[in-house]
Design a protein with these regions (language model features):
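Positively charged n-region of N-terminal signal peptides that target proteins for export
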Residues: 1-4
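Cleavable N-terminal signal peptides
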Residues: 6-7, 17
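Amphipathic/hydrophobic helical signal segments and adjacent flexible N-terminal regions
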Residues: 18-83
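Edge beta-strand at a domain terminus
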Residues: 66-70, 162-204
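Mid-length scaffold segments of soluble, non-membrane domains
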Residues: 80-145
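An anionic, turn-rich surface loop/hairpin at beta-sheet edges
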Residues: 98-111, 147-173
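Short beta-strand segments that buttress and anchor functional surface loops
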Residues: 122-128, 148-150, 184-189
Length: 204
């Protein structure tokens, strides 16, 4: 804080004109909060997407994949990734499997999610369900937000802090895929699937 103050003062006198210094608050950066393991997971998001689709098709779910259209197209992202504040219908699809005998395609009914403002970042919460991703949405690019969060289970009432439990840590890419449609892509989750995709549609 002291360094920041001095930098602002120096900036104010750099031109020789007495003026009120203007200090900019640093932009939030997910890289400052993420674990090394999750950096790797995010870098492999496309790899996990392609692998999960191949597993689903090999498991005789080609028609299920095709039916989802842009939602399960790895290259469907368009500009405008930032999720607006509000309530959403959110439907999870689990693609691929971490075990030989596990299902390679599971589509769950839509549940309720909410996005709220929290300074220069946003807060994402799944309101109901047995597995509830909860965490922070960071700006990354015009085509991506980064989600860092944890998985809240069953009747738990509070989320663990990100980074406390590697089995609960979650990282994902939020992308817009239509005029009023987004998705959250979660590569290599700790349980069950190779990739989770959450379909996000505004509730109103």
């Amino acid at each position: 804080m002291r360094f920041l103050f001095l930098a602002c003062v120096a900036g104010g006198f750099a031109t020789g004109v007495a003026s009120k210094p203007v200090c900019k608050t640093p932009e939030p950066d997910w890289r400052q909060d993420v674990t090394p393991a999750d950096v790797t997971r995010l870098h492999e998001v496309r790899e996990s997407f392609v692998k999960a689709l191949a597993q689903a098709r090999a498991g005789d779910h080609g028609k299920d994949v095709a039916r989802e259209g842009l939602l399960l197209d790895p290259d469907a992202a368009i500009d405008g990734a930032a999720l607006p504040v509000g309530d959403y219908h959110c439907r999870t699809i689990k693609l691929g499997s971490q075990s030989v005998s596990g299902p390679s395609f599971v589509s769950y009914p839509a549940l309720d999610c909410r996005v709220t403002a929290n300074g220069k970042v946003s807060r994402f919460v799944r309101v109901n369900g047995l597995q509830r991703p909860t965490g922070t949405l960071y700006p990354a690019s015009v085509r991506q937000q980064v989600f860092l969060g944890t998985l809240v289970l069953s009747d738990e009432t509070r989320a663990l802090n990100y980074g406390r439990d590697t089995d609960r840590n979650m990282i994902g890419a939020v992308e817009r895929i239509g005029p009023r449609r987004w998705r959250m892509v979660l590569p290599y989750p700790r349980f069950d699937s190779t990739l989770d995709v959450i379909d996000l549609v505004p509730a109103n």
